[in-house]
Amino acid sequence: MLNSAACIVLAITAVLGRMIYTHFYSNTCAAMKRALAHIPELHFEEDDTPERYRTETRSLVRKGYERYLQYGIPFQMRNPVSELGNQVVLPVKYLEEVKRAPRSLYSFEAFSEKVFLLKYIDAPRQTDALLYAVKLDINKNMDHILNGLWDETQVLLKETVPVTGQITIPGGELACNIIARTMSYVLVGPSLCRNPEWTKIAIEATFALVAGTQGLRDRYSPGWRWLARFQRSSEKLGEVREKAMELIKPLHEERMKALKDDSGQFRNFYDTIFWTMNKRKVDRSLRAIVDQQLFLTLASIHTTAGTLQSILCDWLAHPEYHDEILAEINERLAAFKGAGGKWTQQEVNEMKKLDSFMKESTRVNPVGCMTVQRYAQRTHTFSDGFVLPAGTIFQFPSDAVHHDPKLFPDPEKFDGHRFLRLREKDANAYHYGYVSDTTLNWGAGTHACPGRFLATYVLKFAFIALITQYDLSFPEGTGKPGYFYFDNSVRIDPTAKLDIKKSS
């Protein structure tokens, strides 16, 4: 128990801390506003309320693209997290300089800290060891994991859909269960990926982080947020971590033993637990390794599931593409069966009509309307003289770029052959995992999503299995669902239902 003198000291410290922080915070906001004064500000013309910046960002950024960005002019707009000051949207002409900039100048990690309050809720973070495991080890070992992804898709769907009869299931739930299972095959390996307790963790980790961040903002104003460090600010995230540690502990011990014995047993492990532990200068403690797996679930499960749901909805909404795509798939399935039921990357990549359809769906239905989101850690002057002040959160308008009629003619029309035609001009470009200054779904440059090739195979296998082995349809009286918007995020309504049954 604190004595009365200690209580008085604590109270005085809290009050003084509040006064100092409030003064600093107010002055910082004013200084930030002055620092951005040279950048045009975009508002909603009517009803310019904070709520509209949470739910209508996509339409406002499209207007900003037409008014400013297509002419190479940046603009600023309100940040839904008002304490961070206005966010800046940059035209693509600055993308090359941002791609080449070091993290000490423009940082995604700092952006995440600011937006999600990671240090206050003790959230998992990405490490360099994990980044290299995803970027190098997964891609290098893709041939070893490819057929496991296909097998897990098959098993999950057999568990979900009865042999006879039809079920009705929310599209988001179906997609999330498939992606959680198949991604987990690579994250934690075959022995844990089918465990329902792990699947629950893989799905709930993102919700726990968002709830922790929002709860912290609801309970503490910026001036008092430092107090959260002395409390358990995200109980749900803590519970998720504790359960994950319990489940991963045997795998962690098994891989630690293999590394110490150096007996060659490590060659049997094809998962990010081992690949992360096998890096030099890495924290191999159970807590650290578990946090890396939780970070991967945050980065991969819900975004990929939202993408899969969108692709399925576009498939049902555009039956005019069914015959030719199914013919292409069936040709490759015949080759797959002829090879003893083994996929190769080449066989999957040969399905170019399928690839084009999926890429068009992702262009039309992004999981976010922004990309390359960064926090400016220092003031920087670009080559044309434009100054971006330190402390600025900025990003690039991927959705608006993908709807620029000069780049994508008739952009509001769904054209499943769009990228097939583009690939005829350049066979190495415009495939699903391709990144460029005009195809920005995966980010850009060396900072592009390192797991995009894994996600591509996961999505293709799920899509192929669903449309060749099952009958899918929208429930009677319904069609393609509408969108949910939140801040810069977009996705098809995850609660919208699908009817599914085993094909006869």
Swiss-Prot record:
Q: Which residues form the signal peptide?
A: 1-17
What effect does gene inactivation have here? Leads to the loss of pyrichalasin H production, but accumulates novel cytochalasans, all lacking a hydroxyl group at C-7.
For activity, the cofactor(s) needed are: heme
Q: What is this protein called?
A: Pyrichalasin C-7 hydroxylase
Q: Does the keyword Coiled coil apply?
A: no
Q: In which pathway does it act?
A: Mycotoxin biosynthesis
Please name the top-level EC class of this enzyme. Answer: oxidoreductase
UniProt-listed InterPro entries: Cyt_P450, Cyt_P450_CS, Cyt_P450_E_grp-IV, Cyt_P450_sf
Which residues lie in coiled coils?
A: none
Function field: Cytochrome P450 monooxygenase; part of the gene cluster that mediates the biosynthesis of the mycotoxin pyrichalasin H, a tyrosine-derived cytochalasan that inhibits the growth of rice seedlings, but also inhibits lymphocyte capping and actin polymerization and alters cell morphology. Pyrichalasin H is indicated as the responsible agent for the genus-specific pathogenicity of M.grisea toward crabgrass. The first step in the pathway is catalyzed by the O-methyltransferase pyiA which methylates free tyrosine to generate the precursor O-methyltyrosine.
* One biological process term in Gene Ontology: secondary metabolic process
Q: Gene name, please?
A: pyiG
